[in-house]
């Protein structure tokens, strides 16, 4: 899967569009790296005052590409760790970004897509938005800091229910 992260500028805002609608804007290592690179460019550009992350085709993100995740299970632990580190690097870059980062969510934000939205300073959601952790339904544990974020944004009991 190629990066499929489109970076545009609208006024003083950098817009990062997850552009992989045929796979429900699934995330992957190339997209993680492109996201970090785009944030580095936005940080060094004094004309950019904010970043918006959105998805193409009425979908924010279904999270990780399950086919890739399943094939990763056959890889050496180091390869698996490298893939997870890419996501965590992007999440950390969002969390520590010195300018506001806004998730503009339309449709589903699931799994790592939900974690990505939670890393942002603000989530603006359309009336058709759906937020779901989804990890346990595919026998995975939450990644991307989703469990950490949820436990700090809402009561523990509700966060536990969502996880």
PLM-predicted stretches and their roles:
Residues 22, 30-31, 65-69, 116-119, ...:
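Short, glycine/charged-enriched secondary-structure capping and boundary segments
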Residues 31-34, 83-86, 116:
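Hydrophobic alpha-helical membrane-association signature
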Residues 45, 72, 97-98:
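Acidic-histidine catalytic/liganding microenvironments
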Residues 1-56, 92:
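Conserved CoA-thioester-binding segment of acyl-CoA-metabolizing enzymes
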Residues 4, 55-93, 109, 137-139:
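Glycine- (often His-adjacent) and acidic-residue-rich active-site loop
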Residues 92-163:
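Crotonase-fold acyl-CoA enzyme core
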Residues 16, 20, 35, 53, ...:
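Terminal peptide-recognition signature
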């Amino acid at each position: 899967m190629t990066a499929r992260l489109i970076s545009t500028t609208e006024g003083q805002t950098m817009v990062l569009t997850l552009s992989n609608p045929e796979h429900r804007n699934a995330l992957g290592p190339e997209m993680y790296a492109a996201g970090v690179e785009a944030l580095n460019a936005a940080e060094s550009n004094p004309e950019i005052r904010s970043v918006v992350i959105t998805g193409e085709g009425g979908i924010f993100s279904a999270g990780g590409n399950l086919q890739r995740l399943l094939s990763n299970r056959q890889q050496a632990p180091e390869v698996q760790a490298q893939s997870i580190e890419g996501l965590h690097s992007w999440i950390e870059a969002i969390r520590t970004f010195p300018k506001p980062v806004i998730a503009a969510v339309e449709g589903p934000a699931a799994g790592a897509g939900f974690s990505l939205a939670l890393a942002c300073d603000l989530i603006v959601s359309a009336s058709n938005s759906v937020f779901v952790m989804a990890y346990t339904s595919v026998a995975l544990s939450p990644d991307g800091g989703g469990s950490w974020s949820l436990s700090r944004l809402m009561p523990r009991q509700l966060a536990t229910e969502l996880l």
